[in-house]
């Protein structure tokens, strides 16, 4: 994939720069990946830029420029790396089911999602649910660590469901996981 599809206003020299994948966790970085340096609740991604570069990141997206810029590494400064990652993941995994219903609230999310899932299934619709119980669908079962997963994971799951011709998804959206 090439950068110009995802970032506007790049210098011409960088428009055709390619990448193999992207992550916000430096431990998951592989050769020629993009690293999104995100401020989390416990960690600041900017503190892991060097680790990401050592692991193979060649493009860094951050809200700060790192001093002592490494040769061969492109830095892209954005005001909100988390929002940039969400937009990036949404474009990268651009094919998703047509009908996505999100359920949020203090109590009852799992029950409501399960009810919707059963109703659609009884009506012979190809349906999946995502939430506390993981990902559930015809022939698809996947455990998840959190009720609401990160933006890369949710986009990847939705794209995979679309590949399996599932057009209806009901998901739990915890208020903590929304952005």
Q: Where would I find each of the regions flagged by the language model?
A:
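N-terminal leader/targeting and accessory segments in enzymes
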Residues: 1-87
